[in-house]
């Protein structure tokens, strides 16, 4: 058996990635979220495949087909809510995974980090297009508002929007292509995950101390397979609690009303995981400025390795940087809350202040805190 595991062309790839992989002996539970993201992706692909068997990508029947899945298909409601809430779990794990990378300085593994940023954008695009498919009020108006942002691009903007729509408004052509993209993108994500892991295994994992682990490695199996399984149990517990007790907790009631181009909902807002970026978009009165702020709120992750001024890799022994990190976390919670509120006083002002603070913390305050710590340590 050992020979097959180590010599078979396919098995030896699996073996070197998940069984005999040398891993740092001290990685904490914050390192569990990579495998949890893999589990979420698998869940989304499987549930999505079964949903696609019953869904019809047509403006006349899309809403009815989703209703049919929930009412008439065997356990269709479970599959549908697993898929919807699975997306929320995906983003929850994604945000924690990125946060862990920031806190422990994993962004110094630049290839892995950059592929991760591409993955984040791809997952966000997939989730956005998936939200359009049930063809409820929020699906339709969300698609209209977000695709319309591209019209802010000078000269080619309007043509670009109409090209994406496949007409002069969000209609049948838009829904059909969004379904096609929503189906193919998870497989592209799976391929990018392979690249992400390939780059990670070139350098090996970081650890909570931010030091080299070369002198102290342990095999991935059984130590971290068991540890990942424990994390998976907690994830399953949380997901199933959500699906079976309050499946619509994170959804929008407006999406239970069929799409109506003649009636705009009072508050157009995306799913909770996009609210922080939506708040940043809305906090700038200028359309192009808002779109740029929206893009840069995510793209800013790409320049974080360049802003790393500390002499230590991890924040484990840097209390000042830790404080800045948790202020940033709190700021993201505030932005998420503001994104779900109507555009009126005092929410506008709070949103603008939180947006300025978000960019200031990453671009100015964090590098300065690191420099102060260097001075305190006489480095």
From Swiss-Prot:
Q: Which InterPro entries match?
A: Cyt_b/b6_C (IPR005798), Cyt_b/b6_C_sf (IPR036150), Cyt_b/b6_N (IPR005797), Cytb/b6-like_sf (IPR027387), Cytochrome_b (IPR030689), Cytochrome_b_C_euk/bac (IPR048260), Cytochrome_b_N_euk/bac (IPR048259), Di-haem_cyt_TM (IPR016174)
What Gene3D superfamilies does the database record attribute to this sequence? Cytochrome Bc1 Complex, Chain C
Looking up CDD domains in the UniProt record yields: cytochrome_b_C, Cytochrome_b_N
Q: Which cofactors must be present for this protein to function?
A: heme b
The molecular function GO annotations come to: metal ion binding; ubiquinol-cytochrome-c reductase activity
Q: How is the cofactor bound?
A: Binds 2 heme b groups non-covalently.
- List ligand-binding residues for a ubiquinone: 201
Transmembrane segment boundaries: 33-53, 77-98, 113-133, 178-198, 226-246, 288-308, 320-340, 347-367
Q: Which residues form a coiled coil?
A: none
Where is this protein found? Mitochondrion inner membrane
Q: What is its main location?
A: mitochondrion
User: A single GO CC term, please?
Assistant: mitochondrial inner membrane
SUPFAM superfamilies xref list: a domain/subunit of cytochrome bc1 complex (Ubiquinol-cytochrome c reductase) (SSF81648), Transmembrane di-heme cytochromes (SSF81342)
Give the residues the record marks as binding heme b b562.
83, 182
Membrane-related topology note: Multi-pass membrane protein
- State how it assembles: The cytochrome bc1 complex contains 11 subunits: 3 respiratory subunits (MT-CYB, CYC1 and UQCRFS1), 2 core proteins (UQCRC1 and UQCRC2) and 6 low-molecular weight proteins (UQCRH/QCR6, UQCRB/QCR7, UQCRQ/QCR8, UQCR10/QCR9, UQCR11/QCR10 and a cleavage product of UQCRFS1). This cytochrome bc1 complex then forms a dimer.
**Belongs to which family?**
Belongs to the cytochrome b family.
Quote the record's miscellaneous comment.
Heme 1 (or BL or b562) is low-potential and absorbs at about 562 nm, and heme 2 (or BH or b566) is high-potential and absorbs at about 566 nm.
What is the name listed in the Swiss-Prot or TrEMBL entry for this protein? Answer: Cytochrome b
Q: Which species is listed as the source? A: Hapalemur griseus
